[in-house]
Structure formats: structure tokens, C-alpha cells
């Protein structure tokens, strides 16, 4: 309508009418494309909203557009191989890592305990037991200690009572009370030393019904490799035993499971070397990570850490990653490059529709989408791909628009998300670069440097391309 009105106001000659008609036909084609997508969706699903679309239960089946990576992950999980995932943010690397943990064979998980070492207190002994047995062992030791404590308390009261009675009969009550106090504190010291023999559970796998999954992204050395807590009281019998201060790291908690590390190149080289050592020897001792701590004097026996490593990052990760660690992954696993887009065919459009249903179900707070709204999301995926006849696979950002549209619908009190909500959400979920570019354009409009509506003979505007995730190029 704006084009037709501009044509009348400008009195565009007949020679220029064809150009206006072509532009108008292109606008009509875009609308027809949305209708075409909607009809395709209706042919896939005999539904009216995404609420009726079935979402797969298995996490690996919820991965969208990464067919090659899914096949590699299935093979790696079956054979317990390491995997290095390289790709842009939001393409499903973390989801693949979590899905792989569900696919790992259910081996006999083990609990890990730390025992005191009478020969060398600063080298606690490490023992493994079947899953769920560690707590039983601790309960047995506590019950035994409690029984011994009750017996000693009875003996203590008997001895103190006997001393007081004898002191009264001999007329030496003051000396009797003094002796009773000495015996009382002596028994307390013996009780403290006796409690040292109770072991500590380092890894408790009783809560896992499948292979453990640990996300070590951004973890510091102590959390990843284990640590020994500082003890301010190191003498006089008041210090905490070394084995009770030992804390297991993620590489130990992931024993017979999976350790996922995103942006692995951000880890220090020393930490990458330690991870490599743990992968090679399938065991790694725990020691204090701070040289200023008393825990630095403690170094346990080797703690089992037979884990599968799934590392992720971008292309720069390959440059900063420890060469030996990458070689270990390649030698005992796979390297996978994540796709950024997929062809806009019927099968992949169906996947985007299922993705919308998955996001709504996962969020559990936003309403479901109408078919017209889903068709608009498909068109948004086409626009964000920055590639002809393709759909984007940066689904985290696309999911952000889905949630934003749901929030708009909720704010208006609507039970179904429509195209109108998506149009409003597109404005709300713009990137910072997009917002800055729009602000710049509005400022320039005030000075009439260029026009953005209508048609005018003899005036030419510069071409500005607004790419997804960037400003004006």
C-alpha cells in the first residue's frame, strides 16, 4: 500500500511502473512462502497447536540437525570413546554431551572412600567398593564408634564415682575431685583420637541410575582435580585428620561416567596436562592445590578416574588446546565439526516444528504455538541462517525468540502464541548490535539523509545489509 500511495504522489511515469509492480510481487511472494510453510506443517502434523506434537523422551533424539554428530556420539558412547566437538555457540554441543552420558553402558559403578594411613598420615589410603556400599560402611563404623563411646562413658562414670566414694571415705574429697577431672579430660582426648579411624566417602554414586555426568566448564583446579582443605589447627591433638580433609574432583566423580568441558582451551596448560595424565593412567592422586595451605602436604594414593571426555569449543580451541591432549582424543575417540545450518527441505522443517514443541515443553511456563506462529518461526530460522534455502542450527538463539514470544503472549493474557506475538518478540529479543544499528538509523532519519519508505524519482539510497548477530555491514 505504501508503494502504491508513493506512486500516486510522485506521479511515476509508465516506464517506472514495472519496477514498482516487481517490488510489490516480491512482497506478495514472502506472504505466500509463509502460507506454503503452514500448509507443509499441516501435511506433517494433523494438529492445531504444538501441544499435540509428540516430543521424544530420549535426549539424543531431541538433537536437531546434527545427524552426523549424533551418529558419532552413539558410536562413541557404545565403545566408550572420547569426543571433541567444534562449532559455534548454541549448536547443541552441551546437549550432545548430556545425551552421550545417557547412552553410556551401565557399568558397575563404584564408591570411593579415603582411609587413614597409620604409617604415613599425609598419604591417605584409597579404597573402592560397589555402588551404595560406602554409606553402609560409614554407618557401620559410626555404630561401632557409638557403641564404644557408650561403653567408655559407662566405665568413665563408674571410675569417677568410685574415686569420689573412696575420697569421701578417706576424707580426701579435694584430691578425689582433682583426679576425677584429670581422668575425664584424658578420656575425652582418647575419644577424639579414636574417631580418626572412621573413613570418609569421596565419591558416592548411589544417586545415579545411569553413568555419571559432570560438567567441568569453567571449574578451577581444586574443583576439577580435587583438593585438600586447609587445617588451621595442626597440633595439640586438635587438628582434623588428613583423610577427612580430602575432597574429590570432577575427574574422580566422573569415574566410569562422562566429563564434559566446554571451551576446554580456557583451562590452564597444567590443568590440561593433569586431565591427560588421568585419562592415560585412569587414576589421579588428590593433593592440595594451594602452596600456602597445609593441604599441600597431603597427597593421597591414586584415586580412580576412568572417565570419558567430551570436550567442546570453537576453531580457536584447536590452537590453544594442549597438543598431547588433542592427540589423546584423536587416538582414542573422534573429532566432530558441528553444522551451522541445514537445507530447508520438508524433513528439516518438520524438525524445526518439533524443536518449538520441545522448547515449550522444556520451559513449562509459556503457552503453546499455533501453526501460523510455528510457520513464522520456520521463516525466522531461514532468515537467521544467512544462507539461501537453509535453516539455522544456532537453536539457542532461536529458542530465545520462542521464549520471548511466549512471554509476550503471557503478558497479554493469551493462551496461544500467534504471529503477532512473534513480531513483537522479534523487537524485544534483538541483539545489542541490532539495537545500536536501529538507534543509529533513527538518528540519521532526523536529518533526512536517506529515506526508508515510499518512492521518489531521482533519489538513490545507499544499500545497508543488516546481518543476523551483527550491526550494519
Task: Identify the role of each PLM range.
Residues 1-4:
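Short, Lys/Arg-enriched N-terminal segments with co-localized hydrophobic residues
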Residues 6-11:
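Short Lys/Arg-rich cationic patches that frequently serve as NLS/NoLS or arginine-rich RNA/DNA-binding motifs
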Residues 19-346, 354-406, 411, 415-416, ...:
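Conserved ASCE/P-loop NTPase catalytic core
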Residues 418-423:
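Long, K/E/R/D-enriched contiguous segments that form extended
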Residues 425-429:
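Terminal C-lobe "cap" of eukaryotic-type protein kinase domains
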